[in-house]
Amino acid sequence: MTKYVFVTGGVVSSLGKGIAAASLAAILESRGLQVTLLKLDPYINVDPGTMSPFQHGEVFVTEDGAETDLDLGHYERFISTKMRRVNNFTTGQIYESVLRKERRGDYLGKTVQVIPHITNEIQDFVARGADSAWQGNTDVAIVEIGGTVGDIESLPFLEAARQMSLRMGRNSAAFVHLTLVPYIASAGELKTKPTQHSVQKLREIGIYPNALLCRADRRIPDDERAKISMFSNVPLDAVISVWDVDSIYKIPAMLHQQGVDNIVCEALGLTPPPADLSMWDNLVDALEHPQHEVTIGMVGKYVDLTESYKSLSEALVHAGIHTRSKVKIEYIDSEDIEARGTEQLKHLDAILVPGGFGKRGTEGKIAAIRYARENGVPYLGICLGMQLAVIEFARHVAGLGGANSTEFDPSAPHPVVALITEWMDREGKVEKRDTNSDLGGTMRKGAQRCPIKPGTLAQSIYGDDVNERHRHRYEVNNVYVPRLEAAGLVISARTPTENLPEMMELPNHPWFVGVQFHPEFTSTPRDGHPLFSSYIRAALESKNRRDPQA
């Protein structure tokens, strides 16, 4: 039977529950256990697909096409299990499901209430998510409950977790609480009172944490840990100091050295083999001892909140690990390029334009792409970054003045990028869209395998085919492809059924690639990713061309 670890947070949000949960999962997996993770989000949105990146950060896309919380990206990067739609659910999905059942008459005329109907539905969703991995033979499911203890939105989830623990009995569930121990500079000391109150709030609900992960900007002294232990009624060895580090990939070792996995295994009645974190040690060693250094310019419009590009930033770090390179990422506001020009790009070793939506800042991105193309700077365009590369090429090389996307200019004289109106999803179902379709849940999403054109740069990177995840509404317009190809652009991959362009490249450029998919979602620190590794190697070569002494 699957055992559960519920991870909660207190005092403030954004403490790193997702990293903590993923790190614990990585340790347990290294001990031979079959582990999966779930994220429970207390907002009423059905999913984060239509939420602003400034509000929510990145939307992570799973293989089966679900738009999910960015923490699922951390989960996939830390353990081998692939996340699916059932690994992330929201209050909106829970209420939607309960209301459908009520309309069907499933509750036989009963008054539908938060307890038991909503809490029972949450428990069913949790069990379904746990059973989806390992052919239903999951040993441990780690369940991260979003929000902060004390918030009204999280109460049904916490109550459901309490009920699950009670119903399953002894050694079936454990609770790990992540909390903040702030340092007050004026007093020159760490303050434990917020943590004490947070645990008291959790105990009022009926949840007694097996371990406290105490976040601080420094190591927490033993006397402060003892104070937390006494007032929280948590054993001293289960009060864990979690301090700031320069890489999230150091967290598994930090937690293991303080025995968090032993505490959890004891609470669950498990006796797995010892942990083997040698892979994580090797990753950290590669991070701390690079042989090279490159500077990548990421040109976007959400650069004030880098969480919007979390998987992409991590993919570049992974490529650095596998090329023994320190990858410095400079986030450049595309509107700043529109105002000040491309002079600020001259020191970069490579340029990247990520995915995005909307017209704002697109001309700055196009200017950056033109700079990369004309100056032989390695360029990687992802999703919108590929579409804008095609627009730039159409305007300045193929002679299609005024070329644009119908997303930005519905009456463009040359709509080289246009709305996808019909395509086939993973199950073979034909999807149809138009400009009046709902925004939520209407994009082309999920993984798709596509053949690659022989003799291309894409083939040298991926091999004969590519299988990556998508999240977009617009595509390169096939009507214009012959004119673009005649001008020197190569479409190096297409979808097998609809013949939609998936990859483009410029053979006369040192390294210029655009991809309609999101390769960052499949990059992991263990394996890296062939596209990003090739990109970083091209950036190193670019740097050496500019400065042979570097």
UniProtKB/Swiss-Prot annotation:
ATP binds at S14, L15, G16, K17, G18, I19, D71. Transmembrane segments: none annotated. It catalyses: UTP + L-glutamine + ATP + H2O = CTP + L-glutamate + ADP + phosphate + 2 H(+); L-glutamine + H2O = L-glutamate + NH4(+); UTP + NH4(+) + ATP = CTP + ADP + phosphate + 2 H(+). Mg(2+) binds at D71, E144. The active site is at C383 (nucleophile), H518, E520. Gene3D superfamilies: 3.40.50.880, P-loop containing nucleotide triphosphate hydrolases. This is CTP synthase. The lineage of its organism: Bacteria, Pseudomonadati, Pseudomonadota, Betaproteobacteria, Burkholderiales. The gene is pyrG.
